[in-house]
């Protein structure tokens, strides 16, 4: 390679929240795949210390040709908690300037997302029996990973940041123009290295990874998992927002005698939703385990924080707490209404008894 030349690949992840659950065993049967073990079927398998409870199912899909003539390799990945990831990969060789321009064009463009949506729709038509409660409308997230395997001179991570920190920051931001010193510093603060010869810089919608193919496999998977979690928590946030809006409308109609019986039905629906969302969030939250690997755990926390998982997770928890309080209030209102009815019945029975008693004496 000539000086300042890079070799690697660009990975584009377009994730869709398509259903409440994917039955992976049924999916494997439909796709004609062998039953999987507990390990994810990576192109380069992750180490033993990073483990999925239910490994996502992968399948190769058709290649996609962009308007520029670039040809992207395609893969689909199905997660059991209802997320479909459409992954594209483009081999890259060139200068830092070329990679900066490529990042700016991909991050700002929409052509790849349209191809991803088309492939997702085609795929889901084939595997419909494996989908539990498919959604009519899909939320989606996109993420770009610029994986550099080789750099002339084999610089260490500190040398790379010192010599090419400006370009790395531009790549992670998806900006063709130079960044200010403050922006550059903010981007590079979100960097990690396991050894002097590797580096990952994580941004909210893109990441720069300098590592071997085998070494980068876990990093790439953790970045994808963090984005799938973000998608799930965004979905739960929307579901809870809609349900709470309906509850507030019911409460605005009053809590009179008849309204309290209506609140009983609303509280039952709310309680069912509470249980469902709690179960589903726990499943998405605990889908991956780190077995005595603190670096991968720290890398995941960094990735999750950058893409916004904790923010949406907190929003969901706040709305779950609000829903729990509203449920208790509605149940209390219903019990008060029922107690009033029972007391009224007792009084009516006593009055009837007294009437018959006095009539008998008369």
Identify the residue ranges that each predicted region occupies.
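Short secondary-structure boundary segments
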Residues: 27-52, 216-235, 352-359
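Low-complexity, flexible helical/coil segments
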Residues: 48-50, 120-127, 244-247, 351-352, ...
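Membrane-associated alpha-helical segments
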Residues: 235-353, 360
